[in-house]
Amino acid sequence: MLTFVGLGLYDLGDISVKGLEYVRNADTVFLEAYTSRLMGTDTAAMEAFFEKDIRVLGREDVEQTPREILECAAAGRVAFLTGGDPMVSTTHADLRMRAAAAGIETSIIHASSISSAVSGLSGLQNYRFGRSCSVPFPAKGWFPTAPIETIAANLALNLHTLVFLDIQNDRYMRVPEAIAVLEEMAEKRGIEPPALYVGIARAGSERPVVAAGAGANLKEMDFGPPLHILAVPADLHPMEREYLETFAGL
């Protein structure tokens, strides 16, 4: 049995009662630690809380060589822990399909997701979001412009864009850096950069930071520790504008 258990957004208080009960009764517990992180806790605290040893997995362990996960799931109850909600990532959908192909029963225990949290914190209506994108750390000889192209395509349809920010080991992209990268992409592609951004830090914590404004303003702002995420709004509905003025300093 392979059960995907969402941990929520920030700390151990975010897991559901159902998820907690399953993890504590699992035979094996894996933690996928590359698509997201819970910045309000760590692996040692999780092991103490769940009263279980936890095997931390990297991208290759899940996407390229998931044999150990599947073998454990064929023999007993496996809890596969993920930040946010498990099936927001296509990586996890692929693993579930591999398990099904091997005749292994699967299930999902849902949790809060950054996708819904952004709408709640920003007031941007969830049905007005188009395709999301991710901003990677630039590397020597590699500077993709797909993110700004996605944003431009959404804006042309009057749709908001959810922009995920890169995570690499202990390196986390911040909102000001992401805006600077997007502006460089826009210049490279000859695209007008977005006029308005909404930056969010530490969603799910007791004191998340939410700020809306022009890129020049948000690049000068200290959003504090990670994780950060960005939204690029299209034309604002009056209620969206009022919400951002009230809660995000627009």
Curated annotation (Swiss-Prot):
Enzyme nomenclature, EC number: 2.1.1.98
CDD domains cross-referenced by the UniProt entry: DHP5_DphB
Keyword set includes ATP-binding: no
InterPro entries in the cross-refs: 4pyrrol_Mease, 4pyrrol_Methylase_sf, 4pyrrole_Mease_sub1, 4pyrrole_Mease_sub2, Dphthn_synthase
Pathway info: Protein modification; peptidyl-diphthamide biosynthesis
Catalytic activity: 2-[(3S)-amino-3-carboxypropyl]-L-histidyl-[translation elongation factor 2] + 3 S-adenosyl-L-methionine = diphthine-[translation elongation factor 2] + 3 S-adenosyl-L-homocysteine + 3 H(+)
Oligomeric form and interacting partners: Homodimer.
HAMAP family: Diphthine_synth
Name of the protein: Diphthine synthase
Lineage of producing organism: Archaea, Methanobacteriati, Methanobacteriota, Stenosarchaea group, Methanomicrobia
